[in-house]
Each structure stands twice: as structure tokens, then as C-alpha cells.
Amino acid sequence: MDSSSSSSAAGLGAVDPQLQHFIEVETQKQRFQQLVHQMTELCWEKCMDKPGPKLDSRAEACFVNCVERFIDTSQFILNRLEQTQKSKPVFSESLSD
């Protein structure tokens, strides 16, 4: 192996920051799309009795309430998970006690 190929091989371990940022953004987009899909499916099943040319006021109110509850519940779960992780001791620390 010559010096140019060995230096490029050594660089394979480093991730391009722009590529890493792009992947993070795309992953966030995917997660958001999954949440929207879950919310749409859940609220559609709950609120839509029979599809028609126009959304009636009862169904509209149901959709609004469903979306708000979905967001509230998702936020509650995220907050609870954060609290749980913060209160847990690090695994290696708990073994040393």
C-alpha cells in the first residue's frame, strides 16, 4: 500500500461533519413523519365515522382534540423518559457501591 492510499484509509474513520449533520436532519425528518403518520392513523380511526365531501363540526372538533392529546401525551412521555434517565445512576457507578 502506498502512502496516499494509507492516508485515505486512515481518514475513513472520521465522518464528514456535513454528512453527519445531513444524516441527523434526515433522521429527524423521518421521526417526524412517523409521528405524523401515527397521529393521522389514530385520529382518523377515532374521529372519522364516514368520509364525505365535507368535514362536519363534530369530526373537526374530534380531530383537533385528538391531535392536541397526541402531542400532550408524546411530550409527557418524553419528559418522563428524561426524568427517568436523569435519576438513574450510571451503570458502572452502581456496580462499585
Curated annotation (Swiss-Prot):
Recall the GO molecular function terms of this protein's record: identical protein binding; metal ion binding
One GO CC term on file = mitochondrial intermembrane space
Q: Kindly list the biological process annotations in GO that this record carries.
A: nervous system development; protein insertion into mitochondrial inner membrane
Subunit arrangement? Heterohexamer; composed of 3 copies of TIMM8A and 3 copies of TIMM13, named soluble 70 kDa complex. Associates with the TIM22 complex, whose core is composed of TIMM22.
Phosphoserine: residues carrying this PTM: S57, S87, S94, S96
Please list the coiled coil stretches.
none
> What keywords were assigned to this record?
Chaperone, Deafness, Disease variant, Disulfide bond, Dystonia, Membrane, Metal-binding, Mitochondrion, Mitochondrion inner membrane, Phosphoprotein, Protein transport, Translocation, Transport, Zinc
- State the species of origin: Homo sapiens
Q: What is this protein called?
A: Mitochondrial import inner membrane translocase subunit Tim8 A
Record Gene3D superfamilies: Mitochondrial import inner membrane translocase subunit tim13 like domains
